[in-house]
């Protein structure tokens, strides 16, 4: 996946799972115009998941279905549920996407934090909950210091919802009540 605004810069070529719950984009910000970058791009790494717009898979290998509609980060969760599969990337297959920073909204911030939280909450790693809390505090501070208080509020709402237990997730699959709550706090950042 490459950036629409800067078409030679790679956003990611799949993503890597780190310590079972953290993730980061592979080959992030690699410049496809540089010869050395192309050599780096050829080096295959174990990929954990890929974005919907450039990720193909055998439908018979699917064990758990994702939502039948796009929800921010559902490709990450889908990849997490199917991380045992051997994923390969292909040079020459690409798509250009709008920079995620331009897509930030209050609802996206809520959903993004929720998506990041799920692997940490179900991880058996000793410090997963602590690292999730550090990530949460950092994101809320960044939003607050940028005067994006509605984003910060949505992240706090998401954090609390994530800790509400299984019933919350089952009762809110359609996001209907969550959208109402998000709309109620969204006045300036639409």
Predicted segments — roles?
Residues 67-71, 76-96:
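Catalytic donor-sugar/metal-binding loop of nucleotide-sugar-dependent glycosyltransferases
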């Amino acid at each position: 996946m490459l950036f629409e605004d800067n078409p030679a810069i790679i956003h990611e070529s799949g993503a890597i799972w780190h310590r079972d719950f953290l993730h980061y984009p592979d080959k992030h910000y690699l410049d496809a115009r540089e010869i050395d970058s192309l050599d780096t791009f050829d080096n295959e790494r174990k990929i954990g998941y890929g974005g919907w717009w450039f990720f193909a898979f055998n439908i018979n290998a699917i064990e758990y279905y994702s939502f039948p509609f796009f929800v921010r980060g559902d490709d990450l969760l889908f990849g997490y549920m199917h991380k045992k599969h051997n994923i390969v990337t292909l040079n020459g297959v690409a798509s250009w996407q709008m920079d995620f920073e331009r897509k930030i909204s209050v609802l996206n911030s809520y959903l993004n934090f929720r998506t990041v939280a799920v692997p940490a909450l179900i991880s058996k790693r000793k410090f997963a909950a602590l690292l999730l809390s550090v990530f949460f505090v950092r994101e809320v501070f960044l939003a607050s210091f940028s005067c994006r208080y509605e984003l910060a509020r949505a992240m706090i709402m998401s954090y609390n919802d994530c800790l509400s237990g299984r019933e919350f997730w089952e009762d809110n699959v359609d996001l209907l009540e969550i959208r109402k709550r998000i709309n109620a706090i969204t006045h300036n950042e639409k």
